[in-house]
């Protein structure tokens, strides 16, 4: 069938309709929280607060900055490893996150911050909205290079909605704990994305296989995303925790788990290569698995060595998943997981949910202290008869709920995205920026040492400097006055490893 990827009419109209709708809904429902309102000075006087430093902004904003950088820079650049899809990886991630945070502020506001007919907006709302969008960024990794920006916006709309419902049931009705989002963010996002890409299976995707790989510089850009995520992940897992020991503990546990996953990733990556070399895909992704795996139990008394153990096993399983499980899923189950989110978010997310359940089930006053266990798990009041085993069961139910919501929601949304009018590219044009972006003409200059140049046929590399531009290039860069070696210019396609 003919694929129409011209979005000149559809994309602008969709973006404008969505943004105008956001303006109207914000105008009707959203108001500043008292701590962000000009009447804050009256509240300070009423509560006898002497300093503006008591405002929640000063406690939460540093964590928000870190989480925000992870969503827009970390996830965006992590997906730039594809040689011809860097514009789309960063640009479409930017688009989905910008729309997603607005819709998430509304959805989460209606469920969590709704008072007297209005959503009260504060910095805490911004953190929760970023968490919600992070789940969408995870799912984006599974369909990267295979869907249009129109499909991405539709997927974001539905996923944010489902995420909010799942999170509300898990945290408020089942009353599970999930500080770092192993279940709500990573497990839900991963299996939602995997289900969508399974429904959108492309039988002729092999025709685009030459672009579904990296080159040297694209792997370096992706590593920037990895480092942003790795550095800020302790803030991510602790951002929504209670102030004090709980938040402090969440950051420490995440820090340790991340460190352990780096060493085990390097070890396994070297072991499984015949010549003991490292695979950049493993280093970019599996080194982050410790942050995912420790998420649910991050604010619990996991102990420092327990956090290291979680990171240890997450790094191993994630690396093995990239090496062996991803090819199996694609060849046997028809799951085309572009970024391998099953290995970075899916498996570690399930591990995180199980670790949280076990840690909660075996918590005791000897470890937490009687007031500490009440504070950490909310025992008391209507939960006065709540036992640690009941909390452990709640954690397992929360994990199963996230999986069920992801699978059912992914199937429904997948069939919606499968409709032919969203401007998706054909199988042979996947993973290509030029389908949706104005891409500059590329003329890549390669210096070839003279001793090597003479070993090739002069019809390919002459002994004197020569510039061979692409057929469409109108301007040829000047040759350096005295090049140290023969100069040849070739098209980008010939540089693919």
Swiss-Prot record:
GO MF annotation: an example: ankyrin binding
Keyword Transmembrane helix: yes
Membrane topology: Multi-pass membrane protein
UniProt topological domain (Cytoplasmic) ranges: 1-9, 83-93, 146-151, 201-219, 273-282, 326-340, 417-497
Glycosylation sites: 48
Compartments (UniProt record): Cell membrane; Apical cell membrane
Tissue spec: Expressed by connecting tubule cells and intercalated cells of the collecting duct in kidney (at protein level).
BP GO terms, sorted: ammonium homeostasis; ammonium transmembrane transport; intracellular monoatomic ion homeostasis; regulation of pH; transepithelial ammonium transport
Bilayer-crossing regions: 10-30, 62-82, 94-114, 126-145, 152-174, 180-200, 220-240, 252-272, 283-303, 305-325, 341-361, 396-416
Main location: membrane
Keywords for this protein: Ammonia transport, Cell membrane, Glycoprotein, Membrane, Transmembrane, Transmembrane helix, Transport
Post-translational modification: N-glycosylated.
GO CC, alphabetical: apical plasma membrane; basal plasma membrane; basolateral plasma membrane; cytoplasmic vesicle; plasma membrane
InterPro entries for this protein: Ammonium/urea_transptr, NH4_transpt_AmtB-like_dom, RhesusRHD
Presence of the UniProt keyword Mitochondrion in the record: no
Pfam families per record: Ammonium_transp
Domain of life: Eukaryota
Reaction(s) this enzyme catalyzes, per UniProt: NH4(+)(in) = NH4(+)(out); methylamine(out) = methylamine(in); CO2(out) = CO2(in)
Extracellular membrane side: 31-61, 115-125, 175-179, 241-251, 304, 362-395
Subunit (UniProt): Homotrimer.
Family: Belongs to the ammonium transporter (TC 2.A.49) family. Rh subfamily.
Protein purpose: Ammonium transporter involved in the maintenance of acid-base homeostasis. Transports ammonium and its related derivative methylammonium across the plasma membrane of epithelial cells likely contributing to renal transepithelial ammonia transport and ammonia metabolism. Postulated to primarily mediate an electroneutral bidirectional transport of NH3 ammonia species according to a mechanism that implies interaction of an NH4(+) ion with acidic residues of the pore entry followed by dissociation of NH4(+) into NH3 and H(+).
Protein name (Swiss-Prot/TrEMBL): Ammonium transporter Rh type C
């Amino acid at each position: 069938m003919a694929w129409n990827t011209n979005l000149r009419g559809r994309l602008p109209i969709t973006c404008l309709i969505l943004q105008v709708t956001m303006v109207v809904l914000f105008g009707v429902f959203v108001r500043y929280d008292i701590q962000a309102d000009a009447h804050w000075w009256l509240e300070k006087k009423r509560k006898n607060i002497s300093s503006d430093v008591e405002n929640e902004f000063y406690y939460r904003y540093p964590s928000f900055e870190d989480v925000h950088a992870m969503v827009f820079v970390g996830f965006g650049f992590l997906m730039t490893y594809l040689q011809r899809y860097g514009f789309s990886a960063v640009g479409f991630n930017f688009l989905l996150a910008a729309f997603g945070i607005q819709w998430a502020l509304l959805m989460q506001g209606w469920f969590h911050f709704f008072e007297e007919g209005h959503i009260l907006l504060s910095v805490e709302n911004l953190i929760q909205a970023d968490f919600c969008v992070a789940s969408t960024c995870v799912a984006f990794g599974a369909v990267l290079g295979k869907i249009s920006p129109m499909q991405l916006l539709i997927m974001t709309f539905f996923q944010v909605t489902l995420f909010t419902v799942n999170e509300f049931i898990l945290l408020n009705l089942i009353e599970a704990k999930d500080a770092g989002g192993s279940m709500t963010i990573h497990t839900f996002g991963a299996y939602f994305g995997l289900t969508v890409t399974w429904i959108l299976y492309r039988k002729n995707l092999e025709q685009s296989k030459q672009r579904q790989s990296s080159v040297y510089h694209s792997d370096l850009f992706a590593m920037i995303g990895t480092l942003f995520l790795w550095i800020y992940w302790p803030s991510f897992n602790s951002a929504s925790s209670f102030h004090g020991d709980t938040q402090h503990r969440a950051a420490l546990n995440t820090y340790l788990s991340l460190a352990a996953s780096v060493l085990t990733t390097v070890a396994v990556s070297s072991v499984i290569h015949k010549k003991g070399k490292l695979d950049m895909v493993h280093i970019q992704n599996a080194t982050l698995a410790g942050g995912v795996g420790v998420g649910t139990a991050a604010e619990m008394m996991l102990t420092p060595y327990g956090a290291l153990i979680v990171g240890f096993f997450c790094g191993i399983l994630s690396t093995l998943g990239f090496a062996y499980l991803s090819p199996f899923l694609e060849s046997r189950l028809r799951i085309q997981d572009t970024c391998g989110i099953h290995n970075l978010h899916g498996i570690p997310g399930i591990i995180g949910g199980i670790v949280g359940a076990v840690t909660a089930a075996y918590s005791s006053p000897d470890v937490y202290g009687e007031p500490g266990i009440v504070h950490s798990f909310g025992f008391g009041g209507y939960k006065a008869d709540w036992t640690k085993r009941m909390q452990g069961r709640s954690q397992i139910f929360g994990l199963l709920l996230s999986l069920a919501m992801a699978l059912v929601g992914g199937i429904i949304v997948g069939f919606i995205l499968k409709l032919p009018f969203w401007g998706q590219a054909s199988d042979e044009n996947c993973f290509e920026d030029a389908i949706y972006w104005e891409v500059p003409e590329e003329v890549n200059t390669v210096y070839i040492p003279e001793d090597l140049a003479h070993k090739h046929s002069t019809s390919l590399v002459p002994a004197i400097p020569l510039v061979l531009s692409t057929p469409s290039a109108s301007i040829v860069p000047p040759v350096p006055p005295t090049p140290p070696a023969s100069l040849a210019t070739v098209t980008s396609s010939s540089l693919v490893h």
